[in-house]
Every structure is written in structure tokens, then in C-alpha cells.
Amino acid sequence: ELLSPGGSMKDRAVLSILRGAMSRGALAPGGHVLDATAGGLGISLAALCAAMGLRCTLVMPDSVSPLWKKRLEAYGAKIVLTPAAQGSAGCQEALARLRREDPAAFVPDIFSNDDAPQAHREGTGPELLRQVGNIDYLVAGVGSGSSLTGCAESIRMQCPDCRIIAVEPFASPVLSGGFPGSHPLAGIGPGFIPDNLNLYILDEVIRVKTPDSLALMRELAEKDGLLCGPSSGAALAAAILVAQRPEAEGKTVVTLLPDSGERYLD
């Protein structure tokens, strides 16, 4: 997905969310989009708002790198910084204040907005089926839960026996019943179970260790020429574990590499 205009799979979800909001009248032409994010979601929001003639304001901690801030501003986004010591609570407080100041502004909420998985039900899942054919295993990381849910629901319609496997960090095994923890695998393991994740479609959860994920991320670049992010390394680590199982011999294992690694070089 690094070939998406914003460099990540989040482009699909953001485009679907913005189009859905505009079609329902929740977001007017030339309207204002607000969100709190210091990750790849911000790039997708900034880029797509620019392309759709929308104003974009993003809240993030002041610990964000100057280059990251410049990237977002290059798309015309307005950046509101909060003290890093206040953590996510400080960002959410600032976001709430901005919403009070502009009640007509639209907040995407990628973790619970059903337009996000719909992008993958209608797009990514059918694309995989066209390109791959029968799929025996779908292995994907869980951030907002949108890509795994949407792809899985779409693929299961054509491949009812496909096993759906979620990937999460070993250090934050919330889907496995553990406790949230800090980790460097940006894009997965948010520390909670998102509303957009369809738990009922999951057959299994695989926990991946940080060193294994980062090693495969580097291997993708050095041996395959694919400069992907850490969540891609995590997904690939889990997919390899699945492919090595005796029962997977001769089967088709599909995984998703969500974003470009360039943004993590700062």
C-alpha cells in the first residue's frame, strides 16, 4: 500500500469516510476536518482534504519531528501542538476545544466509523480476490481494525473456508486478553479493541515480537526493494509463521503491507 498517494493504506479508509460524510451532509463542500493524530492517518487526512478542497486541522504532541510537521503543512494542513507531557489526553482535550469553537467541523473517528471498513469490503478485498484467486489464509495487523474487517468480510463471501488471522504486538496483547503496553510497531496495537474490528470473524490472533518485525521490515527493503513501515514487518512475520505450518503447505497465504517506511526514517 506504499504506492497509495499518501503512502499508506489509510488513504482508502479516509477517502471512504470523507465521501460518506459529504454524501450524508455531515461534511459540507469546503468544510473543516478535525482530528488528533501524529501517525500516518494525519498524512492521509491532509492529502485527501487538499485533493477534495477541504480544510484540515490536526492536533498532535509537540514531540513530533519537525520534518513530520513540515510534511503535513506541505499539504496545507493546520497543525495544533500540545505539550508532550500531557500525552493523548492533552491532544483529546485540544480536539474537544476545537470542536466547541467550530461545531460544524467533522471528526473522522477511524476506529468506529463504518465507512472505513467499507472501503476494504468494496475495494481491497475484491482486489485481492481478483489478483490472487482462492485465499486460504488472510493475515493482517490490527490498528483501527478496518482493513482486516473489511477484507475478511469480503473474502469470506467467496472463500468461506479462509482462516482470518489478526496480528498484534507481543508487547501489547489486548486481542489475546492481555494488557496494553508501549511498542514501536506504529500502525498496530493501539492498546484497546476498536469498534471497527469484527471479533466474530477472527479465527486466531498471532502476537509478534518487535525484533522479528523490525528485522523483516529491514529485509523487505534490503532484499526486495520495498521500503515499508514496522507494521508491514509485523504482518510479514506472522504470515511466515502461518506459511511454515504443515497444514499450510500448498495453501495461499495473503498479508497486507500497510505503509511506506520513509516516514519512519526521521
Task: Put a short name on every predicted segment.
Residues 1-266:
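PLP-dependent amino-acid enzyme catalytic core
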